[in-house]
């Protein structure tokens, strides 16, 4: 009899993208369902039917009693959801959104598998670690991992969306050095204001093209900025075919979400990571550090950003320095065995293990 799987996710793309990837790995061999909160729905394909469990955050002390009461209610709702659908495996991608379903799964003695795409063990995953069957991550050197838990740890290649494996190699039709900026859906001052000054100077010394992802409110500002400074550019807020955009890049400047870095790495696009300083447990820095330690990327500290040094650094990269080529070659070596079939088989082996 086929095991029924429920994947619990929600919140940001950092949680939802791995969930979608796991869903696509399992949908042909298991009856697979997804649960998310309202925010997570925006990342899901309309063809995927999702149950909504809208878990409240626990960061407001004034509303804490109400939030805890709601979580109790959602745990009961999750209990009946799991029971009604005969779920035998729960896969959680972490985050506070997973609390009700993981609690209900524990009560029902359902096998729980945790996914940790970051290099720092998340708080929700850490809380449910003792209740789980396995913790699936990308490295054995996971930060904040409690002692005596190594037997639950199992590693896989980073989860990459299927369309990335099917992405054809980009054929350049010009001599422009293409820089892609991924500022996130909310945008950020350093991506939308500070970096631009460097591009103006760089454009006087090198032939460049900028592809800039930002928030909707900043699109017109950036389009006008690049136009006024005669810099060829494309500015956008969201693109369902981001893989087709990223493959055009000679270089990417990005935050350091686990999925973003894994996808850039897989497409062999050298990147400069500017970790979000306020990320929980500094996990974005640790994500980027994983690649830097393998000489696959550069890291810039946002708090100590130096415009003059950055301009000089970009000039070196546009000339495809030895350092640039080393990063590109190392990225290729890093992803040598990351194929859809290899990851698929590893996931199936993990969840089907007796």
What are these regions (language model features)?
Residues 7-10, 31-70, 216-218, 303:
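Conserved nucleotide-sugar phosphate-binding/catalytic loop shared by glycosyltransferases and other
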Residues 60-89, 99, 107:
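An amphipathic, basic-hydrophobic alpha-helix
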Residues 1-37:
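N-terminal subdomain of nucleotide-sugar transferases
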Residues 87-89, 231, 247-262, 269-270:
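Acidic donor-binding loop of glycosyltransferase active sites
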Residues 298, 303-335, 353-354:
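Conserved donor-nucleotide binding/catalytic region of nucleotide-linked donor-dependent transferases
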Residues 336-354:
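C-terminal alpha-helical cap of glycosyltransferases
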Residues 2, 31, 38-39, 108-167:
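Active-site-proximal region of nucleotide-activated glycan assembly enzymes
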Residues 24, 35, 39-48, 165-252, ...:
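Donor-nucleotide binding loops and adjacent catalytic segments primarily
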């Amino acid at each position: 009899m086929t095991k029924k799987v429920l994947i619990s996710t929600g919140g940001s793309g950092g949680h939802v993208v791995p969930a979608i990837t796991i869903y696509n790995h399992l949908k042909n061999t298991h009856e697979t369902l997804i649960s998310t909160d309202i925010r997570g729905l925006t990342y899901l394909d309309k063809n995927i039917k999702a149950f909504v469990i809208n878990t409240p955050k626990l960061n407001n002390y004034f509303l804490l009693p109400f939030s805890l009461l709601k979580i109790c209610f959602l745990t009961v709702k999750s209990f009946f959801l799991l029971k009604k659908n005969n779920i035998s495996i729960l896969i959680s991608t972490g985050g506070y959104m997973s609390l009700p379903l993981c609690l209900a799964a524990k009560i029902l003695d359902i096998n729980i598998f945790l996914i940790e795409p970051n290099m720092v063990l998340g708080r929700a995953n850490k809380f449910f670690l003792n209740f789980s069957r396995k913790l699936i991550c990308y490295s054995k050197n996971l930060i904040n991992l409690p002692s005596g838990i190594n037997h639950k740890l199992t590693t896989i290649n980073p989860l990459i969306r299927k369309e990335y494996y099917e992405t054809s190699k980009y054929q350049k039709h010009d001599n422009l050095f293409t820089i892609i900026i991924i500022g996130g859906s909310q945008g950020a001052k350093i991506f939308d204001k500070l970096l631009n000054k460097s591009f103006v100077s760089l454009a006087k010394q090198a032939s460049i093209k900028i592809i800039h992802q930002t928030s909707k409110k900043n699109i017109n500002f950036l389009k006008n900025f690049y136009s006024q400074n005669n810099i060829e550019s494309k500015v956008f807020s969201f693109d369902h075919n981001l893989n087709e955009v990223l493959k055009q890049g000679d270089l990417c400047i990005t935050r350091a979400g686990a999925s973003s870095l894994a996808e850039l790495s897989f497409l062999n696009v050298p990147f400069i990571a500017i970790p979000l300083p306020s990320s929980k447990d500094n996990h974005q820095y640790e994500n980027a550090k994983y690649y830097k330690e393998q000489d696959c990327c550069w890291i810039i500290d946002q708090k100590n950003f130096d415009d003059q040094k950055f301009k000089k650094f970009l000039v070196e990269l546009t000339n495809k320095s030895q350092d640039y080529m080393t990063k590109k070659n190392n990225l290729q070596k890093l992803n040598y065995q990351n194929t859809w079939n290899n990851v698929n088989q590893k996931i199936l082996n993990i969840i089907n293990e007796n």
